[in-house]
Design a protein with these regions (language model features):
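Metal-dependent amide/peptide-bond hydrolase catalytic core
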Residues: 5-10, 14-15, 20-212
Length: 212
C-alpha cells in the first residue's frame, strides 16, 4: 500500500512511468575563440548536436518523453569550451521502451572530430505497468471501497513513487492511497482536508478486509 497522493479526483494510480536521469558529458579542447579557433573543439557545440539526436528518441504515442533539463558549460565568451554537460530526464511507460532508451544513450557517439562523450546515470525507477495483476488488485480494492460507500476510480501519472519498485517485483500494489489534492511541486500545492477521514477509512478497510 503506497500512500502517495491520489489523483486530483481521488483516483488511485494503476500505472506510473519509469524514470531515468542521464548525464551526458562532452569533452573537447579549449582554445582562444578569436586567435586560435581552429585549435579548439567546442564541447557545447557537441552537446547541441546530441540534443537534436535525443529529441528523436521521444515517442508521444508510446508515452516516452526526453527532456534536457540542465545544461552547463564554458568559462568565458572568448574561450572555446573544453567541457560541457547536460542532464536529461526520461519517462517511459513500458519496459520495452526502457530498454530502447537505455541502449540509445549508451550508443551515443560524438559528431565533432576529436570530441569525446561520457554517459552516466540511467533508470532509477522501472515503469509501473497496468497489467493483469494490477487490474485484479485494483478491482479487489474497489469492491472493498464500495462497502464504505466509496466509488473508487483509477488513473495514472508520469511521476514515479516507491510503488514502481514493488509492482516491478510482481508484488500486488495499490498506489495513490494518500491525501486528495492538487498542484504537486507548485506554489498552489494543496491537500483537501475533508478528504483525510475518507482516505484513512479506505486504508483501514484495505488492511482489515483484504484476504489472501
Amino acid at each position: 500500500l503506497c500512500l502517495e497522493p491520489a489523483l486530483p479526483d481521488g483516483s488511485l494510480k494503476t500505472f506510473r512511468k519509469g524514470v531515468a536521469d542521464f548525464t551526458v558529458i562532452a569533452h573537447g579542447r579549449s582554445a582562444h575563440a578569436g586567435a586560435d579557433p581552429h585549435r579548439g573543439i567546442n564541447a557545447i557545440e557537441e552537446l547541441a548536436y546530441q540534443i537534436m539526436r535525443l529529441r528523436q528518441l521521444a515517442d508521444p504515442r508510446r508515452g516516452t518523453t526526453v527532456t534536457v533539463g540542465v545544461i552547463r558549460g564554458g568559462t568565458r565568451p572568448n574561450v572555446i569550451p573544453e567541457q560541457a554537460e547536460m542532464i536529461v530526464d526520461v519517462r517511459v511507460s513500458t519496459r520495452s521502451e526502457m530498454s530502447r532508451i537505455e541502449a540509445a544513450f549508451r550508443s551515443l557517439r560524438p559528431i565533432l572530430e576529436g570530441a569525446r562523450l561520457e554517459v552516466r546515470g540511467g533508470f532509477n525507477r522501472p515503469p509501473m505497468e497496468r497489467n493483469a495483476q494490477m487490474i485484479a488488485t485494483f478491482e479487489r480494492a474497489r469492491a472493498i471501497a464500495a462497502t464504505l460507500g466509496l466509488a473508487l476510480t483509477e488513473g495514472g501519472t508520469g511521476g514515479g513513487s516507491d510503488a514502481n519498485f514493488t509492482a516491478a517485483l510482481g508484488i500486488p500494489t495499490l498506489d495513490g492511497l494518500g491525501a486528495v489534492g492538487n498542484g504537486a511541486h507548485a506554489l498552489d500545492e494543496h491537500v483537501r482536508i475533508d478528504s483525510l477521514p475518507l482516505r484513512a477509512a479506505l486504508v483501514a478497510a484495505l488492511l482489515t478486509r483484504w484476504t489472501v
